[in-house]
Curated annotation (Swiss-Prot):
It is found in: Cytoplasm. Homohexamer. The gene is coaD. Belongs to the bacterial CoaD family. Its cofactor is Mg(2+). It comes from Thioalkalivibrio sulfidiphilus (strain HL-EbGR7). This is Phosphopantetheine adenylyltransferase. It catalyses: (R)-4'-phosphopantetheine + ATP + H(+) = 3'-dephospho-CoA + diphosphate.
């Protein structure tokens, strides 16, 4: 049986912490689906198509990775993908409470699914998409935190 993991998120934009999680997941699973959530309630900085494109660029060197956009219930998307594992990243203890609640809700909605938590490499443990956007908006260098295409997209959008 092929084991498929889905790594859902807004990825606004995808960071090197995200790509670190995906890279390590490719060694654990037959296929990793990076599911870029529409997340209209979060009012994303980049639209869904832009976020999918940036994620594809950042992950292009990984063979068993697919990037796709989605909206709606994650449990439904998981079934559509025939996936067994929800992959989530934990940067700090502060992330755990929210992630624990999400895992419990997903277990209730789809008991056949498992949630697996991975932590990023130490150098990315403090990186978040919102911090990257804030630093970029203030004219800071974010090239250590995101890929070249993301740096270019941030500069183009922010002027």
């Amino acid at each position: 049986m092929q084991v498929i993991a889905v790594y859902p998120g807004t990825f606004d934009p995808i960071t090197n912490g995200h790509t670190d999680i995906v890279r390590r997941a490719t060694r654990l699973f037959d296929r990793v689906v990076v599911a870029v959530a529409a997340s209209p309630a979060k009012q994303p900085f980049f639209n869904l198509d832009e976020r999918v494109g940036l994620a594809r660029d950042a992950l292009s060197g990984l063979g068993n990775v697919e990037v796709t956009g989605f909206s709606g219930l994650l449990a439904k998307f998981m079934r559509e993908q025939q996936a067994q594992v929800i992959l989530r990243g934990l940067r700090a203890v502060s992330d755990f409470e929210h992630e624990f609640q999400l895992a419990g809700m997903n277990r209730h909605l789809a008991p056949e699914l498992e949630t697996l938590f991975l932590t990023p490499a130490e150098e990315f443990a403090y990186v978040s998409s919102s911090l990257v956007r804030e630093i970029a908006a203030l004219g800071g260098d974010v090239s250590h935190f995101v890929s070249g295409p993301v740096v270019a997209a941030l500069k183009a959008r922010m002027g």
